[in-house]
Amino acid sequence: MTETTSGPARGSRTKGTKATKGLRIERVHTTPGVHPYDEVVWERRDVVMTNWRDGSVNFEQRGVEFPDFWSVNAVNIVTSKYFRGAVGTPQRETGLKQLIDRIVKTYRKAGEEYKYFASPADAEIFEHELAYALLHQIFSFNSPVWFNVGTPQPQQVSACFILSVDDSMESILDWYKEEGMIFKGGSGAGLNLSRIRSSKELLSSGGNASGPVSFMRGADASAGTIKSGGATRRAAKMVILDVDHPDIEGFIETKVKEEEKIRALRDAGFDMDLGGDDITSVQYQNANNSVRVNDEFMRAVESGSAFGLRARMTGEIIEQVDAKALFRKMAQAAWACADPGIQYDDTINRWHTCPESGRINGSNPCSEYMHLDNTSCNLASLNLMKFLTDDGEGNQSFDVERFAKVVELVITAMDISICFADFPTQKIGENTRAFRQLGIGYANLGALLMATGHAYDSDGGRAIAGAISSLMTGTSYRRSAELAAVVGPYDGYARNAAPHNQVMRQHADANDTAVRMDDLDTPIWAAATETWQDVLRLGEKNGFRNAQASVIAPTGTIGLAMSCDTTGLEPDLALVKFKKLVGGGSMQIVNGTVPQALRRLGYQAEQIEAIVEHIAEHGNVLDAPGLKTEHYKVFDCAMGERSISAMGHVRMMAAIQPWISGALSKTVNMPESATVEEVEEIYFEAWKMGVKALAIYRDNCKVGQPLSAKTKEKEQDGIAEKTEDTIRAAVEKVIEYRPVRKRLPKGRPGITTSFTVGGAEGYMTANSYPDDGLGEVFLKMSKQGSTLAGMMDAFSIAVSVGLQYGVPLETYVSKFTNMRFEPAGMTDDPDVRMAQSIVDNIFRRLALDFLPFETRSALGIHSAEERQRHLDTGSYEQVIEEDELDVEGLAQSAPRQQIPAVPAAPAEIPAPKQAHTSAELVEMQLGISADAPLCFSCGTKMQRAGSCYICEGCGSTSGCS
């Protein structure tokens, strides 16, 4: 059983502190006497989620109740991920009202129990305002709140955990256990291994220690086992090692060596995709690795001097290394396989509010939560687009007052949750209640910047991002000080009062010196300045309720649940995305932020329409009619011909970091052509700019990329040189075999089939060889014009010629099934009820008519009869009953019946990459294939969200938020 601890809130009263009557809660969105649910229109939706790989239904719940303004994607994700109770039982939640009520009523009850509110009326306003904000997708708690709060199971509310490990076998085994329990609950954990003795140090018995890298192997295997044992997502974990640890070089090289193994196994034919069957044979694949560097090391890199590696037990230097060479080795490893990331230790601890209680040694897997060991953090994120006011004529402003009120509401709720929360270990429970770390943040920053006409990599964009961050964190600490006056400061505050208030002054000083740019950011800065003055005054008077207030998390699943265009602080992925439609199907749409930006930039309606049409057709703004070249940068995205530079991402992180208590979950994407020197530059400049942590990701650096065109890296010049004998030995006689076309006879059997796909009618004639399968296909569309008719004729000829030259039909089926474009939808074929396009329907029909059962079954294509048989018996294949035995005949001797061997089914042909998400759409348009795993739930390509991956289709995430 999972060990849990729970109890009354600690720090609710501090000796000598006079308690007030409680918080007065103001109405911001709600109306007295009217419940927020009564102000929206509700409708029933059917949620049916399928796996794009094989068409199987992953999840189905019909008749769920949601507001009419909720997107299909948000409804699907919230229903499948957050509704509690078994589907089909009376205990199953059936609507958003039940879900929100389960949470907000629990928060209200706990708030009243722990004396947060001045009166029952204030408690009611709190409940209504919280319900309104969740209902209208203004903010979202992290996933554990949606999973657990208000249910009979343990009330775990935290997504992020930091563990610790000491140099003893007992502690190391406890690490394995505690980490496993956290993974079992669907959360993530990180820790620093630097207390463990290196392999270069002696044990008390006289032998050499194993070293942390050795113990990482066991923890990695444990995480992989839990993942494969039925967890809802991959285990999320982080391992960190200090740069002065004697085993640092081995730590840096762990994933590089494993990546080389993966390449060798992949080239030998093994399935080494990130979700493949054979990936478990390699090590260290379940964790993010980071090196913790200090200022001493970075200055040694800058000067080119030596750096000392220190023994763990004595602290003495046992080895001197070239700092610049070690730094380059880190960059080379990150260039080769995206690990390790880097964390800047002195920068992190310079902003530490509780140094008297211990250093900050570790982080959560996504690197945004950084605080004391054996603590946790519960997250919440605000949807920034909800605070942008736009009159439709290009006049915009950021609603500063409403933003601050929502921040106060959310911080209050987050702090209340610590009072009733459960935790996976006793140590984590005690420390979290003693320090009450919170992690408020935001999503949709990239969309906000584009909508306001600001390039992501611009001074104006960075000014808005910094101003919002400053106001958010300042308001959070102000509310924390107000809470301290009501229910007391956190237990560790008395010991850390001086450093905590010093960090508050650092935030305020950074706010005062920030550069103001335009009419959008200036009012936000002004409000932030006033807020930080309140923080300093109230903090000195009351103390603070929370040791930490803000982080910027990836906001993967919750970002999609809020229908955000962008996650965390990320820029937009692309200008064109998929939108799911009510009733099924989807369509490609240009981001709604594009017309907003164009209006802000002064374009007229006719110009905007022409530019949007150009983007819809080409996927970018290059050569868009009437668009000024100086405005191109406003529409730069994470991917594409005009993608944001790597340093553009770093500059944005540096612009935000001074006003975030924790850190920022961010991966800096780099093109495949990036060099090791560029990685070094990013790591070095980020340190100088004051960033706390980052990771880089170079396109195509990992083997686990579906349909990667790369099969091996270029050999280094020294290795590439071959002697004359080697070249001579490699020369072999090559015999070239050319395919021969086998034409059909004059008279050939054929089948003509009519079909309807999404209302479009057509006819298919399939002619075959008398004895050898399909050899010709003709297609004709009804009432579709000469252009489409000509294209279908050309397509038919190309397929027919290929078949006659020997291209197997199953190859065409694997390539063209699941291809998605309009017209798509319902068909009149009982065996193919839904088609994603005309060619999807055609080749599914051809597979059913001409391919043997084993071949098409391997491709996931079955008839209606076979699907029904699978539901009834668990098998698609027809069971042939044996004839009744002749009992009398058994008395006679007879030859043993020979049972023919069943031929092995052909190897499954991988389905081609098709655009089922916005990430895949941009890949198809640009010919780029991003390194991202396929979603383990629905089979679509995932996309990056901070340092994690998120599935746009079903909301699954590889991270801990």
UniProtKB/Swiss-Prot annotation:
Where does this protein come from, organism-wise?
Streptomyces clavuligerus
One GO term under biological process is: DNA biosynthetic process
Q: Which cofactor does it need?
A: adenosylcob(III)alamin
Function, as annotated, reads:
Catalyzes the reduction of ribonucleotides to deoxyribonucleotides. May function to provide a pool of deoxyribonucleotide precursors for DNA repair during oxygen limitation and/or for immediate growth after restoration of oxygen.
Record's catalysed reaction(s): a 2'-deoxyribonucleoside 5'-diphosphate + [thioredoxin]-disulfide + H2O = a ribonucleoside 5'-diphosphate + [thioredoxin]-dithiol
Q: Which InterPro entries does the record match to this protein?
A: RdRp_reductase_class-2 (IPR050862), RNR_2_N (IPR013678), RNR_lg_C (IPR000788), RNR_NrdJ/NrdZ (IPR013344), TSCPD_dom (IPR024434)
Cofactor note (record): 5'-deoxyadenosylcobalamine (coenzyme B12).
Gene name of the record: nrdJ
Keywords assigned = Cobalamin, Cobalt, Disulfide bond, DNA synthesis, Nucleotide-binding, Oxidoreductase
Entry protein name? Vitamin B12-dependent ribonucleotide reductase
Q: Which parts of this chain are annotated as the region Disordered?
A: 1-23
EC?
1.17.4.1
**GO molecular function annotation:** cobalamin binding; cobalt ion binding; nucleotide binding; ribonucleoside-diphosphate reductase activity, thioredoxin disulfide as acceptor
| Active site, renumbered | 364, 366, 368
Give the record's subunit note: Homotetramer.
Show the stretches that span the lipid bilayer.
none
Family note: Belongs to the ribonucleoside diphosphate reductase class-2 family.
Which residues are involved in binding substrate? 143, 159-160, 188, 364-368, 554-558
Instruction: Spell out the disulfide connections.
Output: 160-377
Q: Name one Pfam family in it.
A: Ribonuc_red_lgC
